[in-house]
Regions:
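Conserved active-site/ligand-binding neighborhood in enzyme cores
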Residues: 1-711
Length: 711
């Protein structure tokens, strides 16, 4: 389903942020500069309409709660995405293909969809504007159309039992929404909305065949974020988000797709299913947490090629770091090629209105209203991980995931957060590797590790971890050297039960140390192994690799290199956004060319200072009445006053629209590799050029007048 929105007046979906102190109240827009309507605002407006229906007796409170849920543990029956302009995906593609970033900057793009309005407060007694009351507000232009994806929660029993009744109520509530955003009583935010129940094409979630399954399998999954994703911190802080997707969330997704009974049968099988955490991924290369032992010199920069030489403190010689001030590298993730990968996050600002809905804003008082912020992982990023399962488990997982429709994950997934593409894209057989006996290895924890000691108590004692490792290797003489450890807290809040989860400490991901065995051990036994407890949720992933003796302490990492795009013809686009940007740039350059022309001919104006003001006023009058440069020229020729006639003729000869346009077109054709010039109708060109010209002339006249007064 889709919710279609048409703006019947300008709209401001306040973002809670300001831009460059020039805009006091800004709209919400994405990284490309394209404005959108956040789903939480949209859903709140639909909820208001449904509440009005309840108050009028059109629907009951029970029917209302079936659709919108109830505060606490009753979830909403539908999810909603942000509302984007029609043709959003194509516009984003055009902007990303544009290699001229000065042209397609977010502010330039935003200006195509918005404009700035000013407002002030007037003293009712004096009729004069209040001091310091001038405000600027950016608004989205009326006439634009938006669409938001709307999907039923297929796990919701009310949706299964009464699909038509619930759908009809939602349809009525959507159609009743008439205003969105701020200043609704001042002419902003008038909209027309409707629910389109046409089924949308579903994404394919499984790209592997069950025939390829072996006895033991390692299934690769990828998650592409279509909207921001909130992975709440285990500490339960909504103002923070994890920078990865925990295996427990993926396991929960699979459980929901299977159903409770089938999932319990899956867990009861002899082999334990394991779902690793999903980490940031670039070009199919999965990142993993970097070692805590990697350090750099204080204030050490990257070299010209984007590389940095680090020191691995696990086995460094004192002479190598003597007289050097070493600091942690603070690198979050690296891929197999040691390219640094980073996760982009953002903060969005929200408010909850009071329980008394006659109050249209949060007050900050104890009336049920509040202001709050949510941290999330930015949309457009990819994450990947692995599912370890035997043949029967893998087949059941594939069947369940194949039946998924629109996938949403994380906190706030019923509104603007958590829309993802989830795909099982490849599978490899897990089989024993050829034996490789070594004495020394480097152990790195790729996820948090939960440990229990022999008394069944939670612990972070590294000696307990050593016993887990010895059990896998089949030895009893491991010696741990030079540990670099960090400790994290696991906890959170169970929304379903309305209770806090147990809080305890774990050894954090990125922790690393050396292990030595006098007897020697097979390092390949650790391939695809997890240690500790709750490994099915992604905890306990480790990497054990042989310690190489030569130059082990030197580590070279590199920044992600920007892709070099070939410069294509900008005018080969799908949506027209690039053409709008080119026209805006053309207009800006026309105005600049007019300004430069006047600056070059200042002496002409200064020599006729005594009649310049009257000449400019005459030209402004003619400009209002005539629609072409030629008509203006004809009117100037008819001026009876000889001196004024000559000055006016001189002034309009300085700036000829066609000449200015030809000059700008030539420059833009060269700068942007255009195949054909930007063509405007003569009247439009005349209006833009002479509006700018007469404004500059008027400003120049005032400067001359002030200069004369001072003398």
């Amino acid at each position: 389903m889709k919710i279609k929105i048409e703006l019947l007046s300008d709209l401001c979906t306040c973002s809670g942020e300001t831009y460059n102190s020039m805009v006091d109240m800004d709209v919400v827009y994405d990284e490309n500069g394209i404005p959108y309507i956040p789903a939480k605002r949209l859903k709140g407006c639909i909820r208001e309409s449904a509440l009005e229906m309840q108050e009028l007796g059109i629907i009951t409170q029970e029917e209302y709660e079936k659709i919108f849920g109830r505060e606490g543990n009753v979830r909403s029956a539908f999810s909603l995405s942000n509302a984007y302009i029609l043709g959003f995906d194509e516009a984003v593609e055009d902007l990303r293909n544009c290699t001229y970033k000065d042209l397609s900057s977010p502010q330039n793009v935003l200006n195509q969809y918005t404009y700035i309005r000013t407002q002030t407060a007037v003293n009712l007694k004096t009729g004069v504007a209040e001091d310091s009351s001038l405000r600027t507000i950016r608004v989205v232009k009326k006439g634009l159309k938006f669409e938001a994806e709307c999907n039923w929660d297929e796990e919701n029993q009310e949706v299964v039992k009464h699909p038509k009744e619930i759908s009809e109520i939602l349809k009525q509530a959507v159609s009743l929404v008439k205003h969105i955003g701020v200043s609704r009583t001042r002419g902003l935010g008038l909209v027309e909305m409707e629910l389109d129940e046409e089924e949308q094409k579903q994404a394919e979630h499984v790209l592997i065949k069950k025939e390829k399954m072996a006895e033991h399998n390692k299934i690769h999954y990828q998650i592409d974020l279509k909207s921001p994703l909130i992975c709440k911190s285990p500490k339960g802080n909504q103002a923070q988000t994890q920078d990865y997707i925990a295996g427990s969330k993926v396991l929960g997704l699979i459980a929901g797709a299977m159903g409770k009974n089938e999932y319990l049968r899956l867990l009861s099988m002899d082999d334990e299913i394991i779902v690793s955490n999903a980490y940031i991924t670039e070009k199919k290369e999965r990142g993993v947490p970097a070692r805590l032992s990697w350090q750099k010199e204080k204030d050490q920069p990257y070299d010209a090629d984007g590389n940095m030489r680090l020191v691995d403190m696990l086995d460094v010689k004192k002479s190598d770091i003597e007289n050097k001030q070493m600091t942690p590298s603070k690198i979050a993730y690296v891929d197999e090629n040691r390219t640094i990968l980073s996760v982009e996050t953002e903060i969005s600002y929200h408010h909850q209105r009071p329980k008394d809905k006659s109050i249209g804003r949060a007050t900050g008082q104890e009336d049920g209203s509040s202001f709050y912020q949510l941290a999330s992982i930015c949309a457009g990023q990819s994450f990947s991980g692995y599912i370890y399962a035997n043949k029967e488990q893998a087949e059941k997982i594939v069947d369940a995931v194949s039946g998924l429709r629109n996938v949403r994950m994380g906190y706030g997934r019923s509104s603007e957060f958590g829309a993802v593409d989830f795909v099982l894209d490849s599978v490899t057989e897990v089989k024993p590797l050829e034996k490789l006996k070594i004495n020394d290895a480097v152990v790195t924890l790729l996820s948090d590790v939960i440990l229990y000691n022999e008394n069944g108590m939670l612990t972070t004692d590294i000696k307990v971890l050593k016993k887990y490792l010895e059990e896998i290797a089949g030895v009893d003489d491991f010696e741990i050297k030079n540990p670099y450890l960090q400790f994290d807290t696991i906890g959170g809040f169970n929304v379903t039960w309305g209770a806090r989860k147990p809080i305890f400490n774990v050894i954090g991901k990125g922790s690393t140390f050396l292990v030595h065995s006098q007897k020697g051990f097979d390092v390949n036994l650790f391939e695809n192994q997890f240690v500790g407890e709750r490994v099915s949720e992604g905890y306990g992933e480790i990497k054990v690799e042989e310690k190489m003796n030569e130059d082990f302490s030197t580590v070279i990492v590199q920044k992600k290199k920007a892709e070099v795009q070939e410069k294509e013809n900008l005018q080969n686009e799908k949506t027209g956004i690039i053409n709008l940007l080119l026209e805006s740039e053309f207009e800006r350059r026309l105005q600049k060319a007019v300004r430069e022309e006047l600056e070059n001919e200042q002496k002409v104006c200064e020599s006729k200072e005594d009649i310049l003001n009257t000449a400019v006023s005459k030209l402004r009058m003619i400009f209002k009445n005539e629609s072409s440069y030629e008509a203006m020229e004809e009117q100037v020729n008819g001026i009876e006053n000889d001196a004024k006639n000559k000055l006016c003729m001189k002034l309009i000869e300085l700036v000829v629209p066609d000449t200015i346009a030809e000059k700008v077109q030539t420059a833009m054709k060269k700068d942007y590799n255009l195949k054909y010039p930007i063509e405007w109708e003569k009247e439009r060109l005349y209006r833009v050029v002479y509006s700018a010209y007469l404004t500059e002339l008027k400003y120049f006249t005032k400067i001359l007048q002030k200069k004369g007064e001072n003398e």
